[in-house]
Amino acid sequence: MPLSNNVIGCINFITVLLSIPVIGAGIWLAIGTVNSCVKLLQWPVIILGVLILLVGLAGFIGGFWRITWLLVVYLIAMLILIVLLGCLVGFIYMVTIRGSGHPEPSRAYLEYSLQDFSGWLRRRVQRSYKWERIRTCLSTTTICPELNQRYTLAQDFFNAHLDPIQSGCCKPPTKCGFTFVNPTYWISPIDMSADMDCLNWSNDQNTLCYTCDSCKAGLLANIKVDWLKADIFLLLALIGLIIVYIIGCCAFRNAETEDIFRKYKQGYT
């Protein structure tokens, strides 16, 4: 027995609801303190979510008001969007699967290396003109200054579980051998390492280690964590859309619009 138009409309309305986590994931990535300084996939995710919302509304309207051509547009467009969302979910996973912190002796926080991350992510921060914009944005946040309010003793700081970006941007790398004064002010050793990150460190609060590769690595580590969280929501939305799409195809075939297929067959008999 064919499904009623109301049931078809309700099934397609679920598609509208499933667009919410996609749009929400994009907005969440866009408004985060770190992600707001790096414009990567936030807008593609939001745009894809909005398209899913609009196509879902088209299917909802087509189902309730028996607008056959609108249902056909819905099925074709939704298939394309499902494929695009699947590619996006896979892409995010592939570019974030690499990259993790390295422990240092007598430190609770981790150190990060730029070379540990995927080439695609590295290219987003290695170009000087891109990093200058990101660096300027990061230097205006409270990511580093808040550490001075939180930790006054060296041992408390060394036992702290810092965010990757705080570990990479707000202090010199541990291997440089600097002496702690406060989280963002360090005394350099007499025989300082020739490592570029050690040379790039500055006690100027607007500079710190924002030009260091460790800062770029810390930024990517933060992005990786946020993107993997967003990817979970996108994956759940993808699974839901696939299920709804399959049900929608069956409903379209068995509903009252089956007379279109009957006329199509009669044309060949």
Swiss-Prot record:
Membrane spanning stretches: 11-31, 45-65, 72-92, 232-252
* Extracellular topological segments: 32-44, 93-231
Its Gene Ontology cellular component terms are: membrane; plasmodesma
Q: Where in the cell is it found?
A: Membrane
- Residues bearing attached sugar chains per UniProt: N200
Chief subcellular location: membrane
Q: Keywords in UniProt for this one? A: Auxin signaling pathway, Developmental protein, Glycoprotein, Membrane, Transmembrane, Transmembrane helix
Q: Which InterPro entries match?
A: TET_plant, Tetraspanin/Peripherin
Task: Name the domain of life.
Answer: Eukaryota
Membrane topology for this entry? Multi-pass membrane protein
Parts of the chain on the Cytoplasmic side? 1-10, 66-71, 253-269
Checking PANTHER family in the record gives: TETRASPANIN-8-RELATED
What this protein is reported to do is described as: Involved in the basipetal transport of auxin (IAA) that modulates growth and organs organization, as well as cell differentiation. Regulates shoot apical meristem (SAM) organization in the peripheral zone. Required for initial meristematic divisions in the epidermal/lateral root cap leading to the formation of epidermal cells and a clone of lateral root cap cells, as well as for the maintenance of the radial pattern of cell specification in the root, thus regulating the distinction between the lateral root cap and epidermis. Together with WIH peptides, promotes megasporogenesis.
Name-wise, this protein is: Protein TORNADO 2
Which organism does this record belong to?
Arabidopsis thaliana (Mouse-ear cress)
User: What phylogenetic lineage does the species belong to?
Assistant: Eukaryota, Viridiplantae, Streptophyta, Embryophyta, Tracheophyta
